[in-house]
């Protein structure tokens, strides 16, 4: 059923004076707020109850109607005139102030592109002078020729002479017209002439203009009233025609054309939205409802008020004062000053910060105006509409919950009783333990035992959501079934910590309670912790066990020769476990187990089962217990081929086990990498729920046996290593030699530094390799066990403990040439300690900056892609997207192999190998096997379906998107893939480096920007820092390369025999040689490409491929895998607009920017009507600019540049169709994604099914 409360669209436009009066419930006449004695609202004041409604439900202000009686609704009190209704109306009822003098709206005057100035074709500065009573303006030319219409009479020091001259000429004309020397006006004119001629004497401009007006019908004005007069005269249709004629004039400069197009857009927008320009000048202003600008009583009888009230008070006071001044007949200079002050007071109300001198409060800080209330992080949009504080929530420190199942979280009892209070009360009433709410609440206060029973029952059906800030990706909020625990800490399952990026060193988490039936169903079906096995960014398992769990399973699967009970053969599992539990055999002893005792699904050969045994350990028997019977037996670390690998451990009973053990090699234990593979393989064959069940068993085994292994570290485990001093001696000699060379002038400073660093790096590597060898000799050394298993630490840590710390970074992040020779075991000297703190401190500062930078990147990415949702199954596109392995051509190494780019995507067309055999047909989902097949066929590039070529008008289709990496199945309709893409690119942002690598001026190398700065450079489409590559503008052949002492001139000959010359920077690295064929858009020199140039010369596809390759390069260099499809979504949004260059016979305007889909529709329409279609040029917008070009003004305004976006939307009278997610969140609608698009029926059925099963 359709929700009738759902808002369909929202429109914004200029309000005319009558509209403002129609909103109002009364005029505010006095600046007073509330009476200081009675604390009641003053009559006709800013809080008047007659205008805005009663402060208490159904009670009037005079006390005649005291008892709140809903029966009186709609009545007005006969005495005080207050309407009796709910006090909530004070949040919606508006008032108004009738202004004594019109004022301009500051947004229309001062927000670029200065709308009023554009309409009147004036300079913004000149117009401001008119509005703020500095300069007069000509309203009507009359029958004089010295002043043109709309000319500003500038009395500023630079141009006052010219104005004086013109006034003199006009006055001389007046004298000629009067033609009577004795006339009083002639005498006045002569006096004025004298004043104007003598620059040292001041003159009255009012007197001069009124005299000229009297005899020439010319009209002069000043202030907003003059602007209003001119705006009323504007004929939109005539202006549009005139501008179009001017645009046809080819002699116009680009700047003039841009200015004309801006004006044309303004006039066209106003005409289409049926708005009048004079509405930009206000004669009446609305007063917002009082509960939105409240007065609050503080302790001690003092009051605090919203700053907007102060701004309204100033307006009312100045308005009243202007009335009085006018009534008194004061001189024009005083009246104009009052008018200017009124204009400034209204400016301060609308946008105080835009004023040159903002109105300040007592604390010398600008008062918050209506614009300030809207914009920024603390503004209405981001603080109150896009995110709100939520009821039924709690927060506490997290602690580990080793006994929890993967779908559970431990909630402290006191927290749970408060969170579920309403449900507990309901349960007590339903089961007749309490007759009403009051009794139930009393039972809660007294800790009645029945309350705890009620709580236990209530939480069975109600999952809770756990969230850890910062929520960088969708796994930052997951649902769990609550389990009541003692203490005050929330207990978290150890395996979900990776997804939350949580650890137990004091992190806090928030708990939220889903309330409605649909919310509960969604939590259980879509968000349960046990279903989040794979990470969305790369489809790899995110619940990989760590630390103790790895250690326990490593110990469990270790094999040891000559341990207690070696060579025993058991007929059943129980027998083996009993022997272990009674101390007969060691956990790691090699033993035999009859195949008949093991599951038939794993060992199906009947003959073998009767006559053979498996060589294994008790530990491995325990380990294999955690898997299903149809999962292969794991007996070695060959996981992918476990079924075949296990066969080499099966022996016939006729073979003597002791001899067998003597001849076999000890197998490596299961390490972190193997555990990850097992989880991935298990997920592929068994799905999420079963994998979660297996993981819980793996966790229990790991904890149990890591405890039994008793692995600890002591100083004794850290072996002494004295051999290093010989290495140091040799290195010191080499360094001395290098320094001597430098002193003799044979090396530059940077070369000396590089060589010294190389020497010490070599020493550290040598020591590290030797230590690794030493460490491997003692496989029982706890440090070796931890490093080898992948539980914690690595060889480099160990080197620092025993060998040397090595080279450190300085505060700039560059490497220092003096190494730290001591190890932590020996202890550092004071100077060494000081050196080592430098880099550490920089690391901390970097992380802090990086976190903020990465967070802002994510926010911009979300804003640019949030409207992309999977809307249908197949868009049937006309073209595909060609992919091949991404190769770094400079170093000739593969960044992303073709297989990674194919898995999880759909083919666009049939794929054949060289022998014309069909490898995969069109519209087939490419899985690992098909991808392997394609690569084995020797195919190097494949055309696939991509979001970049998806033909949907909005959103994407299932086939162009492909696999949902988080579920390893085809993406569902309604999936908000745009937001997931943004999170997947933004979430690893904190792991990217902040550094720009400098090569220290070594010739032949190019400084490269990497890490986060490079990502920002690409996605913001800014000119690259460092070396910018020269790209060819034409197709052709390099005919000659001229070398002028390191500056090259590259000559390219095109097919038409034209020669194009490119001059390089000094010492540029060339990418072409004589005779090379080049394509338009191809690099001629090393460096980063300017994307605007590439779009112009290479085209859209080149830009798409370049951004994709470069972004992947940055992430892969840091070892972060991100799926192509996420980057493609962002690129799609950056390139989905075109600029109209010629409007043809369509309604589009030249210079207008629209989406490619809309453009295609208009062209199609023109072709059908047989009229000239518009022409366009592709545009690229960075992720900072793209959201501002969004079709939704609500979404754009809440992103950045609120005032500018809203001004533009107002002029266009824009309607927001509420197609994206943000707009709907703001208006309280369900978002058009997920169940908001497809309904909740399916999810509710799923939830029911999951509720009945344990996992």
Swiss-Prot record:
Key words of the record: DNA-directed RNA polymerase, Magnesium, Metal-binding, Nucleotidyltransferase, Transcription, Transferase, Zinc
Note the superkingdom of the native organism.
Answer: Bacteria
Cellular component GO terms held in the UniProt record: DNA-directed RNA polymerase complex
Reaction(s) catalysed (UniProt annotation): RNA(n) + a ribonucleoside 5'-triphosphate = RNA(n+1) + diphosphate
Give the stretches traversing the membrane. Answer: none
Q: How is the cofactor bound?
A: Binds 1 Mg(2+) ion per subunit. Binds 2 Zn(2+) ions per subunit.
Query: At which positions is Zn(2+) 2 bound?
Result: 875, 950, 957, 960
Which EC numbers characterise this protein's activity in its record? 2.7.7.6
Q: Where does Zn(2+) 1 bind?
A: 60, 62, 77, 80
A Gene Ontology annotation in the biological process aspect, one of them, is: DNA-templated transcription
Please name the InterPro entries in this protein's record.
DNA-dir_RpoC_beta_prime, DNA-dir_RpoC_beta_prime_bact, RNA_pol_asu, RNA_pol_N, RNA_pol_Rpb1_1, RNA_pol_Rpb1_3, RNA_pol_Rpb1_3_sf, RNA_pol_Rpb1_4
This protein's cofactor list reads: Mg(2+); Zn(2+)
Q: Which residues does Mg(2+) bind?
A: 503, 505, 507
Q: Which GO terms describe its molecular function?
A: DNA binding; DNA-directed RNA polymerase activity; magnesium ion binding; zinc ion binding
Enzyme group, top EC level?
Answer: transferase
Functionally, this protein is described as follows: DNA-dependent RNA polymerase catalyzes the transcription of DNA into RNA using the four ribonucleoside triphosphates as substrates.
Q: How would you summarize the oligomeric state and partners of this protein?
A: The RNAP catalytic core consists of 2 alpha, 1 beta, 1 beta' and 1 omega subunit. When a sigma factor is associated with the core the holoenzyme is formed, which can initiate transcription.
Write out the similarity annotation: Belongs to the RNA polymerase beta' chain family.
This protein is called what?
DNA-directed RNA polymerase subunit beta'
From what organism does this protein derive? Mycoplasma capricolum subsp. capricolum (strain California kid / ATCC 27343 / NCTC 10154)
Gene designation: rpoC
